[in-house]
């Protein structure tokens, strides 16, 4: 049910967003939410088409008198990142979200909210259902599988679209207009390790780390947030007799890992020394990690005896994880100093019955700049005997500061809000880069209300930014 303080203005956006929070919509499981959009289209006598990938386009006729204006594409993705805290019982494939309002923010109870990109989807649906909005012909493009590799945009049948002006509503800082985004690529490293009984006299332990902030591996990578995988490996670095048994750290390629555990065997002396080091490790991390990470906990618990990797293989794997880069690698010389040009996210580790999977991803504006980082990462993986599977990359969106759409949007913002909007590129993989490659003559702009903590259980939407966002969107459409 809606929390008592659930916002009501603008009515159409908030009602659609609430309905979207009732419908499970993980990546690659968007059928139910797509059915909701189709139902809205049919209820308002709008034609729609579906491509082979599952992307949906709804064709909204122009307001009376606007029929000859150029068609505008409104683009959003249907899926959401599905992350929860370790103590939260929630099935993202079945359960609706539990909403809360705190200090002017809308959030979910210990799960992602899906405002990324649900609030944009809600705005697109509001354009369909609000009879008071004046607009040209619209093509509402709802893509799928954005969060796990931009699969919907990559597979889009562009022949479904006639518009050459596009508004993407998937950025997260109000009063900012985005005209460029990073490209990306990644790897999954794997290996099967033989297992053996733990050495005589060894005991089994589980080292768990929780309480980090985590977050978006693009727009928050420059914040120097703690990486649970790097910290766990650092904690085990001095355990000379460590033999790995199992591990689960991180959830997805585009999420900075916030919690996880590693199970291992070691001799009694090493276990005792590690137990004594836990508080010192946490104090050291607190001394340099941002305040958002100061809730971290490091717990060492006895575990049931288990088969383990050899001492040599365990050392080798821990060393390669310690050596693999993570975080911002280069900053722009042309844009504001906080714009990251090149980054890498060491995202996920799974070890189950000797089977290793290790995932990492990079983001970049210039693919040539990423070549050296790619070489370094793959060289480390080869030294550790890991099988390398490259994840297909996607293009960035090169900024066009001479865009006619941008000029009109800036002027409108100044008139409506008496302020000059910031014009930026974003270090994240918006679908705009792929869509621009499919529609090379399209003029594209991205904006949205304020969201914080995307891709984490602290994701929240600033309620007060939604009314001016809606006012701006509808005013811009009235001018196009």
Language model features with spans:
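Fold-level recognition of mixed alpha/beta catalytic cores in primary-metabolism enzymes, strongest
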Residues: 136-228, 236
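A structural supersecondary motif
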Residues: 241-251, 334-350
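His/Asp/Glu-rich mid-to-C-terminal helical/loop segments that flank catalytic regions of hydrolases
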Residues: 159, 225-239, 270-271, 315-325, ...
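Active-site metal-coordination/substrate-binding segment of hydrolases
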Residues: 66-164, 314, 325-326, 332, ...
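Acidic/His- and Gly-rich active-site-bordering loop/insert found
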Residues: 4-105
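A short beta-alpha structural unit
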Residues: 18-22, 261-263, 297-309, 345-349, ...
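A conserved active-site cap/scaffold subdomain adjacent to cofactor or substrate pockets
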Residues: 222, 253-328
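Zn-dependent metallopeptidase/amidohydrolase metal-coordination segment
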Residues: 13, 342-343, 347-356, 361, ...
